[in-house]
Amino acid sequence: YVRPVSSWKVAVFEHQVIPPKTDMETREEALDALKLNSDVYHEAVLESRSKGVKMIVFPEYGLYDINTLTRTRMDLMAEKVPHPKHGHRNPCDEPEYQTQSSEMLRTFSCMAKENDMYMVVNMAGREPCRRATEPECPGDKQLLYNTNVAFNNEGDVVARYYKTHLFWEEGWFNSSKNYEMALWDTPIGKFGTFMCFDFQAVQLIEQYNVRHIAYPASWVNLPPIYQSIQSHSAFARFAKINLLAASVHRLETSTYGSGIYSPNGAEIFYFRPDIPKSKLLVAEILPIHVKKPEQTVVNFDNPVFPSEDDDVQDLFDRGDFAFLKYKRMTTRAGTVEVCQKSFCCKARYAVKDRFKEVYAVGVYDGLLSAGANNLYFQICTVIQCPHKKCGLKISKVRTHFKYLNLRADGWLDRYVFPSYTVMYNNYIALDPFVWNYTEAGGIETKPGTSTPLHSANLVARIYAKDSSKHVHQSHPIDEGVIKMAVKYMLYVMAAYVYAAS
């Protein structure tokens, strides 16, 4: 039995990974590398405890340097993580976990127990497999998974989650074929966890009526529309949940941005591309009581595959959103509408004084390529166009909007995520108190407000129209994975050069 509470103090930790000092060829060397970062986690837990925190979430890929990963090295770092459905497990107390092969699992279990704190940690999990009976079983006869592990405040493993949609991780991880929510009880209510491109779990949130999500992430920002704090706050607002989003802090790959979000907006967030260090965020969350919806859950087992005629835009080849169809806003006040196919985006607006930069209404209805997946998006946006080119990174905002109403017609699904992003002193920020959102009326700013608008966005993910590229997994790394890694590094280099310019 978990005694309910009226509020709960929680934390997320945005961590800048400490790379290993030497190459990893043994389990001992792998543990040395892991401990460099788990020691920092311990410091964050101690600081959190001093602030009254009852639960902390750590980021995806927070324990190891992604730039040095191979299947062999991940094998050295992986541990077998128990599933709670197979019985009670407390690695801190139980003798079978007092071995080198379970050292990190035991470390985190004891960390949670000794500090009376719930914890969610991302690590490498392993499962043995048989090639004779399991077609997906690699040559090394084991499945390595990108894994979230949740511990309660007594150190028990209360949830385990394997990642389904890999994001250029096929060189070291396997994709889980069993999509399921990992759920556990806390004093504030039931929690769930997932990560990164497994972000379609809004349907499962509604199926299980979960109102609190722990979300470890390694979020690569794609300005100006698909950045971490925009997407995470939009998800929390639409799904009516508390979202604890912890991203790794890796500036060279534009990977950063964490926060604690509620149905009312951001309780606290951190989005600083200019500060190369870790950050602890603490806030209080409240219980959320929402009646379970009656809508039918989308079936993920039967995706709609694109035809050869479909124009699939590759987000990471492009690195921008210039492929949207845009229509410029030319008068101080008015209405602008732009359509693609049968999907139309419409903005009614008024600016203070005059436009000091170019703004436009943009629309997109189609597939976007990301990693091993084609993801179907509908996008309706009002956005600044730096140097008169829309869809590029925005560095400064001087135009203030006195009024904005953004809505769209032709949605293919009701899962529409709203965000309203402003820019103060050249830094992107969230201001949840200046706007409202309803499914019928879209985004509308409140009377008497004037904001330096970065972008207002309505983004729908049409999960039933997603498709897989069917990337083949093998061991050792095959040519396709090498090509993907090269492609990713080219994107990283381009993003770094662009950010520095």
Swiss-Prot record:
PROSITE patterns: CN_HYDROLASE. Photogenic gland (at protein level). InterPro entries: Biotinidase/VNN, C-N_Hydrolase, C-N_Hydrolase_sf, Vanin_C. Residues 20-287 form the CN hydrolase domain. The active site is at residues 60, 163, 196. GO terms for molecular function: hydrolase activity. Keywords: Hydrolase, Luminescence, Photoprotein, Potassium, Sodium. The modification S-(coelenterazin-3a-yl)cysteine is found at residue 390. It comes from the Eukaryota. Its EC number is 3.5.-.-. One of its GO terms (biological process) is bioluminescence. Monovalent ion-dependent bioluminescence photoprotein. Displays an emission peak at 470 nm (blue light). Trace amounts of monovalent ion trigger the intramolecular oxidation of the chromophore, didehydrocoelenterazine, with the emission of light. On the 2D-gel the determined MW of this protein is: 60 kDa. Belongs to the carbon-nitrogen hydrolase superfamily. BTD/VNN family. This is Symplectin.
